[in-house]
């Protein structure tokens, strides 16, 4: 059984160098889970931050589902608590505060047991010349593949 990807943060892979990945649970209300199942989420400007020793997903947009509750509209960009083991939290805290790295959400998905999970990563920001070098390498690879594909014997 495969995972069901809800939202991906493609901008994170472009702007950051991914060093290490983690899988975290996320605290959601029932209406938010319904919205995720309808794939109404966006991680483009999302980031993670420590608040009182706990890790929160900030600025992630989970849209309000019209059929869920008409009388209560929650904040779509509310901070959402991420669930990790204590040792993982300590490791992330050290990496962020001592090494100056950032924690970036990569995707929200439902795992095999239908639990909503967030894939987060410890990342280091790329400089402009690094981004250009990556884009150049990708275009060269793409051109080489098309040349090999169109090659006649």
UniProtKB/Swiss-Prot annotation:
GO molecular function terms attached to this record: RNA binding
Main location class: cytoplasm
UniProt-listed NCBIfam families: PRK05422.1 (NF003843), smpB (TIGR00086)
Cellular compartments per GO CC: cytosol
CDD domains, A to Z: SmpB
Keyword Glycoprotein included in the entry's annotation: no
Localization per record: Cytoplasm
Function: Required for rescue of stalled ribosomes mediated by trans-translation. Binds to transfer-messenger RNA (tmRNA), required for stable association of tmRNA with ribosomes. tmRNA and SmpB together mimic tRNA shape, replacing the anticodon stem-loop with SmpB. tmRNA is encoded by the ssrA gene; the 2 termini fold to resemble tRNA(Ala) and it encodes a 'tag peptide', a short internal open reading frame. During trans-translation Ala-aminoacylated tmRNA acts like a tRNA, entering the A-site of stalled ribosomes, displacing the stalled mRNA.
Protein name from the UniProt record: SsrA-binding protein
UniProt KW keywords: Cytoplasm, RNA-binding
GO biological process, one term: trans-translation
